[in-house]
């Protein structure tokens, strides 16, 4: 009997460690839809759009499917050749506003993204993590670049609709649709007023956007997306905060492939 109880307890722990939800306020039934967000925000300046989005998202106005995080597995070898296995949880899609029936992806500045991440016990991914998320994705779409009015609210919504036309209601971890706003040592070392972007992988697995810190931190365009990562990393089934992982000279390689992995969050 004791063995049965122990087995059941072990399975419950394993099941809990393999699933995660972000805790978000319950969405108000009267909250605006994704379409309505873009109609209201069409004339906004970037900081007005940012503030509007943050207010809606922190109030719980996100599609419920976005709360169910997906595990991404990674591993490295230590100096002795021993495998170190880890996994972490990410949102299945990019930060969005609305209901499951009418929602839309919302490009945001890193300051707004960080505010949302902090509120939901999350952080933004690194370049390596974006690569690993792409490899793990079950829905991989071909990038669709747009060239006119790249930073306009209208173009942001048009791009969302194009992606939805490609997706064709397929569900699961999606990638290949956006450049990620990422954490990078290049920001802390060289360009504190900049943002780092990376990704938008093509079907061959190569990113359109190499790691880039040329944009000022308030620049937001249609191609940017915000992927949230739950801040607890499970290393050999031990729960460790992502900052402690990035500070560890060995474990940081699980999450980061840069020489300096000392940029943990964007100030706001």
Where would I find each of the regions flagged by the language model?
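Second-shell loop/turn segments in exported
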Residues: 97-104, 119-120, 214-215
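Residues that flank catalytic or metal-binding motifs in active/ligand-binding sites
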Residues: 84-86, 120, 222-224
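Bacterial Sec-dependent N-terminal signal peptides
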Residues: 1-22
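Conserved hydrophobic ligand-interaction patch in extracellular adhesion modules
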Residues: 110-172, 228
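N-terminal module-boundary/linker segments of secreted carbohydrate-active enzymes
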Residues: 21-68, 213, 243, 250-268
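C-terminal, surface-exposed recognition/capping segments
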Residues: 149-268
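Soluble non-cytosolic domains of exported or imported proteins
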Residues: 44-48, 66, 81, 103-111, ...
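Conserved oxyanion/phosphate-binding beta-strand-loop segments in alpha/beta enzyme cores
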Residues: 61-91
